[in-house]
Structure formats: structure tokens, C-alpha cells
Amino acid sequence: MNLTAYRDLSPAALRERIRQGEFDGPTAGLANGYAQANLMIVRRELAYDFLLFCQRNPKPCPLLDVTDPGSFEPRHAAPGADIRTDFPRYRIYRNGELDQEVQDITPFWEDDMVAFLIGCSFSFEAALLANGVPVRHIEDGHNVPMYRTNIACQPAGGLSGPMVVSMRPMPANKVVRAVQVTSRFPSVHGAPVHVGDPRLLGIADLAKPDFGEPSELREGEVPVFWACGVTPQAVAMQARPELVITHAPGHMFITDLRDEQLGVI
């Protein structure tokens, strides 16, 4: 998909294109300067447990917004937007199994549903680029690679599961700067959780991500791993609630929140 026509659109204009079905691809590199968000939608009966899960696991699940039960408007992150239509792609999980992937969840929406918007590391990629740190999946025009790890999240109620991480390869001499830059943005995962040998995270093969597409690791480069907001999907697969709706990995919500609003220093 050619992203040129979409790169300079405002968040509202980009959401409108998505709502109309014009754009349904990964959102890395779009709406630079604005925060992007992952999605987890649960029924009200599970909402407190998931809120507690996020509170106990802020690295993979930093909350940007939570809707009122039955409301599909993220009033803090993007007033006037519609959670049901404004992501490029969604996933429907039933009893822990991926049932289908769709572009509009209006037919699946229920009056007691609560939506959680979770910060996404796409949000700090403009800052990485501005500081001379390359972002391979943007360079190569593909989705970021994501992996399940052997790091167990802190459970909450009946929710438990492994942390998922995203990976960005970079020259070894850029790693310190990448840590410095991303540490400013804890609301979108902050500093990396691991640098170097993927086997220490239980990742056997970087060429076979669990979500997204692989990035080439070139000579002299180091893999750098950040906690990822796809973690709730791994939790849904393990906890097996009757119905959960998420974004499709890499297909994020474009908020009206400026990256710099989320910076802490």
C-alpha cells in the first residue's frame, strides 16, 4: 500500500479515511507527532479485571483512555471519534481463539462494552528518526515484528499471560540514544525491556515473529525490544474470555494527543 497520500493527513482526516474503508493498512509512519493506540474491548463484567491488569503491568499496557460502558467515543484521546470504525482492522476473539478480522466492529458492539486505548510505540518513532535512530520497518514499508516472550505479566482476576514485545534492529552505536529518546515516553512503553540476545526472552527465531512481519538484522546491528500493546491479545488467548475485540497488530488508532504531551522530560 502506498502511504505517501496519507503521511501528512491530520489525525481526524486519517480517521475519516479509515472509517470510509479507504485505508486499512499498518499505521507506522503515519500522523507523525501524534500518539497511536492499541485496543482492547471487553464486556463490563471483565472491565475491572482488565483495568487492574493494566495497572499492574504498565510497561506493556500504559493506558491512554478508557470509555464509559457502552460508549464508543474516546473522549480524552480523540473527542468525536468512533472506536467501532476508526481502526484500520480489528480482531474478534471468542473463547481465546481468533474468530475473524474485520474493518468495522459496529455489528459486534454491545451496550455493556468498555474500550481501553493503550499507548503504542509507533508514537515515539518520529522522535527516534529525528535523533538519527533508524526504524527498519518504516524504511522497508512493512509491519513491525512482535514476539511472545517468557516474561510473565502480573495476573489480575482471571487474566494472565506473557508479555509481547516489538523489535527494532539498529546499529550498536545508536542503542544508547534510542534508550534515552524513548525513556521520555512511558505512556507509549518507554525505554526498551531488553537489548541483545533474543533467546533470553524465549524468542527462538527473529525471522518468525508471532505477529507482524520480520525485520532484517544486518551485520553490526543489535535487536532492541520494547514492551508491546499486543500483550492483551496474548492474554486473551490464554485466559479465553467469551468475547474480546482488539485491533489487528500494527493497525493502530490515531489519537489527537501530541507525542510531546506524553513526554515526561
Swiss-Prot record:
Organism superkingdom: Bacteria
Coiled-coil segments on the chain, per record: none
Family annotation (InterPro entries): D-Glu_cyclase, Putative_hydro-lyase, UPF0317
Major enzyme class: lyase
Record's keyword terms, sorted: Lyase
EC number: 4.2.1.-
One GO MF term attached to the UniProt entry: lyase activity
Similarity remark: Belongs to the D-glutamate cyclase family.
PANTHER family: D-GLUTAMATE CYCLASE, MITOCHONDRIAL
Name under which the protein is recorded: Putative hydro-lyase PST_2764
